[in-house]
Regions:
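Structural signature of outer-membrane beta-barrel channels/translocons
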Residues: 60-64, 100-102, 153-156, 192-196, ...
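Detector for outer-membrane/organellar transmembrane beta-barrel domains
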Residues: 188-313, 324-327, 364
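Outer-membrane beta-barrel "beta-signal"
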Residues: 315, 361-377
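Residues that define the transmembrane beta-barrel architecture of outer-membrane proteins
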Residues: 45-55, 91-93, 144-148, 183-187, ...
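Extracellular loop and loop/strand-boundary signature of outer-membrane beta-barrel proteins
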Residues: 42-46, 136-138, 174-177, 212-214, ...
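N-terminal signal peptide c-region/cleavage motif recognized by signal peptidases
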Residues: 14-16
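Gram-negative outer-membrane beta-barrel proteins
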Residues: 33-41, 79-83, 115-117, 170-174, ...
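Outer membrane beta-barrel
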Residues: 21-35, 45-171, 183, 192-196, ...
Length: 377
C-alpha cells in the first residue's frame, strides 16, 4: 500500500511539473550554391551553408514560478549543414538561464553568444542576415558575440523598450586567464520604439580587445547605430547609419605588415557606414528585396559601395527558396569584399593559389550570386 501511495505521489508531482514547464526543440537548415568573381585567384563556384542565415538547432524552455514570473533557459548550436560540422562550440550561439516577468522585464546570464546587442542591427536591413548585407562593409563587426554575460530587457511601454548587456569575457581582474586572449569585455545598450507604420532603434555597444583597448575598428571598437523601418502597404522601407571608432588601432594591432598596403594607407580608426533599401511583398509567396550600402574609412582606406538584389519564394509556412545577387565597387585604396572578410591585403600567391583572405585586389570590384533553400522547425 505504501508503494502505491509513493508511486501516485511521484506521478502527481511529475504531472504538476509538466503542467508548469515547457521545453521546445527548434532549428533551421539552410543549404545552397554560390558563384563569386573578383576573389583572389579569379572566381569560384561552391556549395554553401547559411547564406540566407546560419543553420542552427536549439532548446528553449520555461517554468512557471508563480506571480507571473518564469524561469527561462536557452541552448543553441550553429551547424554547417553542408558537411555536418559544428561551427564553434557546442552551444556557442546561446547558453543562458534567467527570469522573466511581464511587469518587471527579463534578466538572463551566461553565453549570450549570437545575442550580442550589435546583432540586432539586422532589423534595419531588408537583406536581414544574408551573406551580402549590413555586415559586409564593416567586415562582420555587426556579428559580435558575448560570453560570461548579463542582460536585462525592460517591459514594453507603449511600443518602447530598452535592453542592456555587460559581458565580462576574459578581461576583468576577477575573470581572466593568465594571459588574456581573443576578445575582451563587451557592453551595450539598445532602445527600440515600434509604432503603427514601423519602428526605430538605436544601438550603442563596445567590444574590446584582449588588452582592454579598442585596437581594431572592424573587431574591437565602439559602435553607434541608428536605423529603422517604415511600412507602406506591401512595401517596407529600411534605412540606417553606423559609426565605428577604434582610437588604439595600429597596423600591428590589425595584423598587417609594413609595405603590404597602398602608399598612404594605414589601419583605420574610424568608419562611417550608411544604407537604405526596401522589401516588397509581391504576393503571399513572393518577396523582393533591394538595398545599397556605402562605407568610408579614414587613414587613406577609401570607400566602397555595395548593391544587392534578392528574392524569396515560400513553398510552405516553414520552407522557402531564396536568392541574392551582390556587386561591390571599391575606390582605389579600398578592398572590401562582398562578405565580411578580414582587413588587409589578400596576399594572393598564384603558384600555390592561396590567399590571406577573400578580399579583391585594391580598387577592384566583386560580384556574386547565390541561391538555396531554408527549412525551419
Amino acid at each position: 500500500m505504501k508503494e502505491t501511495v509513493v508511486a501516485l505521489s511521484l506521478l502527481a508531482t511529475a504531472a504538476a511539473a509538466q503542467a508548469q514547464s515547457s521545453v521546445t526543440l527548434y532549428g533551421r537548415i539552410d543549404n545552397g550554391i554560390q558563384f563569386e568573381s573578383g576573389i583572389p585567384g579569379g572566381h569560384a563556384w561552391s556549395a554553401a551553408s547559411g547564406n540566407f542565415g546560419c543553420s542552427w538547432w536549439g532548446l528553449e524552455g520555461s517554468e512557471d514560478l508563480g506571480g507571473g514570473t518564469k524561469a527561462i533557459f536557452q541552448l543553441e548550436s550553429q551547424l554547417n549543414t553542408m558537411n555536418g560540422q559544428l561551427e564553434g562550440n557546442l552551444f556557442g550561439r546561446h547558453a543562458t538561464i534567467g527570469f522573466t516577468n511581464p511587469s518587471y522585464g527579463t534578466f538572463k546570464m551566461g553565453n549570450i553568444g549570437a545575442g550580442e546587442i550589435s546583432q540586432d542591427s539586422w532589423g534595419t536591413d531588408p537583406q536581414l542576415m544574408q551573406r551580402y548585407g549590413i555586415s559586409s562593409l564593416v567586415r562582420g563587426r555587426n556579428w559580435a558575440s558575448a560570453a560570461n554575460a548579463f542582460e536585462y530587457q525592460t517591459p514594453t511601454w507603449g511600443g518602447l523598450y530598452f535592453r542592456g548587456q555587460y559581458a565580462l569575457t576574459n578581461n576583468t581582474s576577477w575573470n581572466t586567464a593568465t594571459t588574456p586572449t581573443g576578445q575582451g569585455r563587451t557592453n551595450g545598450i539598445e532602445g527600440v520604439y515600434a509604432f503603427g507604420m514601423g519602428d526605430f532603434r538605436v544601438i550603442y555597444d563596445e567590444v574590446r580587445g584582449a588588452d582592454g583597448t579598442f585596437d581594431d575598428v572592424y573587431n574591437h571598437s565602439r559602435s553607434l547605430l541608428a536605423g529603422g523601418t517604415l511600412v507602406f502597404g506591401p512595401v517596407h522601407f529600411y534605412a540606417g547609419y553606423q559609426h565605428l571608432n577604434a582610437p588604439n588601432a595600429t597596423d600591428a594591432s590589425v595584423g598587417v605588415t609594413p609595405g603590404s598596403q597602398p602608399v598612404g594607407v594605414s589601419a583605420p580608426t574610424s568608419v562611417d557606414h550608411e544604407w537604405f533599401g526596401a522589401a516588397w511583398q509581391v504576393s503571399t509567396a513572393t518577396a523582393v528585396t533591394a538595398a545599397v550600402y556605402h562605407a568610408n574609412a579614414n587613414h587613406g582606406n577609401g570607400n566602397a559601395t555595395l548593391y544587392t538584389l534578392g528574392a524569396t519564394y515560400n513553398l510552405s509556412k516553414r520552407t522557402f527558396l531564396y536568392t541574392e545577387a551582390g556587386y561591390i565597387h571599391n575606390s582605389s585604396t579600398s578592398n572590401l569584399a562582398l562578405y565580411d572578410s578580414a582587413y588587409g591585403n589578400n596576399n594572393f600567391n598564384p603558384v600555390t593559389n592561396t590567399a590571406s583572405n577573400g578580399n579583391p585586389n585594391y580598387g577592384h570590384s566583386q560580384e556574386g550570386i547565390f541561391a538555396g533553400v531554408m527549412h525551419q522547425f
